[in-house]
Amino acid sequence: MSLFNKIVKEFQWGQQKVRLETGEIARQASGAVIVDIEDTVVLATVVGAKSAKPGQDFFPLTVDYIEKTYSAGKIPGGFFRREGRPSEHETLTSRLIDRPLRPLFPEGFYNEVQVVIHVLSVNPEIPADIPALIGASAALAVSGLPFNGPVGAARVAYVNNEYVLNPTREQIKASRLDLVVAGTERAVLMVESEADQLPEDVMLGAVVFGHEQMQTAIDAIHELVREGGKPEWDWQPAPKDEALNARVTELAQPELLAAYQIRDKQARLTKLKEVYAATSAKLEEEAVAAGTVAADKATVGNILFDLEAKIVRGQILNGEPRIDGRDTRTVRPIEIRTGVLPRTHGSALFTRGETQALVVATLGTKGDEQIIDALEGEYRERFMLHYNMPPFATGETGRVGSPKRREIGHGRLAKRALVACLPSADEFGYSIRVVSEITESNGSSSMASVCGGCLALMDAGVPMKAHVAGIAMGLILEGNKFAVLTDILGDEDHLGDMDFKVAGTADGVTALQMDIKIQGITKEIMQVALAQAKEGRMHILGKMKDAVAGANTQLSEFAPRMITIKINPEKIRDVIGKGGSVIRALTEETGTTIDISDDGVVTIASTNSEGMAEAKKRIENITAEIEVGHVYEGTVLKLLDFGAIVNLLPGKDGLLHISEIVNERVKDINDYLKEGQQVKVKVIQTDEKGRVRLSAKALLNEAAAQADTPPQQ
């Protein structure tokens, strides 16, 4: 009898074969599933606490996606030779998995749940994020935890005007779209994408195509659960205290209505805090008078939050003004200023209502590119975008330091939005870093980073293909009534049913991110939302073009200049020198940065044009070939009885024989030459061994012949 109750499900999915299995590995976890897609193998595990911690008032879900270097047949770098802190890719993939799973846990479920996905084997052509998402969904489904899944996921590419399901990495490179969609049988829950200025209907078509194709994976998970699933947890939400609900509503509703008439964010937050405190104090006072135990503040806070949501959503669906007084389609006032910082290469201050981004662009050389040691192989990133949001941006105190998951995710979204409109490395050889410092935040700060990033790049002189703008949208749905909100505030983000961010140019979408919290949002609703987002994006693009018509034609005086020369690849070692000695001396003495590619292209960069010219001259001398008939200004290195060794170019010497110094017979070479003396010589012969024969006498004879030639009439 086997020790394991191993259940396996296999299915064909597009061009790929998928295998799901449970029951053999990690049996003490609440749920564990191995997913194998064409040799990319992940182990997804789920553990759920049997009870919530006392006083818990939120759902503590953590998702950790971990790539093991052995999966690609590698040993980790570093002193300890083991995996360390999560890479940016691991953080982004953890967020990608978290986003569609979180909305499917029932309201009031506060037990701690941890999802851990290990990448065990990697086929470089099959990205591990889709297997990881399917594995996490399947592990939750077999665990018996209260989870309204399963979730399916698919990657969609757009090649030759056709959608491609779960493309290989080679297909992604040729695609104008890289889109990941996740959802249940009935609804899309999450979209993450990067595109090359595609129209809205193509983007929506990709979402619908991906949702249709993921049903195959969802069906397989259902089959796995039927055969290998654990019993469902007997969990029931805590019964609602209707009397407490009614009393909180009676005490707080008028004050909350008044608070949401305040247009200024900080003043409104102050008023809301007062309402929360006053309501809790009143309830405690009543409990003392009645001799009962007062409701805990977390429960009261949740009731007040639900009441806030009901007020704001009701006002919007009834056609009343939004929190800040706008209608559903209006973008907040925009202010733009470029060239804000005097010594940076490019900068822009982009303000939209109470959201503000100070964005700075810096130009560097090839040596400044980010080297990424990914499982599928090492590669370089010439464009980096980093997003920072310090606590003062929302008027709060908090930790300042390394970027949090949210900051990494927002930075990647803004990068995706801009990358399609950057010039190629051949057109613009610089590496580029953009940093977005969020100085004020009230919703849509990642999209402010897109707008500010585009403007800062143009200010730096980067020849962008087009202006790029981004806008954050919201959606509220109640029954058959819905409202799409343009340029949402932070409060509208928290209280809505869907938030999605669209970035692009006048010609199409470059990035789309959707997070949907409820079932029932149809293709038609998404169509309306995308059309309204385009309207908002075009408005912002108009403001940006009014402020900055195009990229600066001149780089900042503080940005490095670059020149490129081509050398014989066989001469690269001469330029580098033993242990890098030659190139190190070159860079230090000329104040330049020098990059040499394997094909012999040498890039010299510096803010000092004289230093660049000197470095160029020296490299040309090092790599030059000695040619017969050419005249060189050489230096006498050594005197011999039969002649002198003369240095012509760095590392290249020749013999000036005693008979080739002057026309008369030379008895003592010291009468004519000294070590260190500059001497003009002509190359008269080279042989297959690289030996060079020189003559000074030949130049004397040529000069005499020219002197004897009568001038032409």
Curated annotation (Swiss-Prot):
Its main location: cytoplasm. One of its GO terms (cellular component) is cytosol. Pfam families: KH_1, PNPase, RNase_PH, RNase_PH_C, S1. Its cofactor is Mg(2+). Residues 629-697 form the S1 motif domain. One of its GO terms (molecular function) is 3'-5'-RNA exonuclease activity. GO terms for biological process: mRNA catabolic process; RNA processing. It catalyses: RNA(n+1) + phosphate = RNA(n) + a ribonucleoside 5'-diphosphate. Coiled coil: none annotated. Keywords: Cytoplasm, Magnesium, Metal-binding, Nucleotidyltransferase, RNA-binding, Transferase. Mg(2+) binds at D493, D499. The keyword Nucleus does not apply. It is an enzyme of class 2 (transferase). Involved in mRNA degradation. Catalyzes the phosphorolysis of single-stranded polyribonucleotides processively in the 3'- to 5'-direction. HAMAP family: PNPase (MF_01595). This is Polyribonucleotide nucleotidyltransferase.
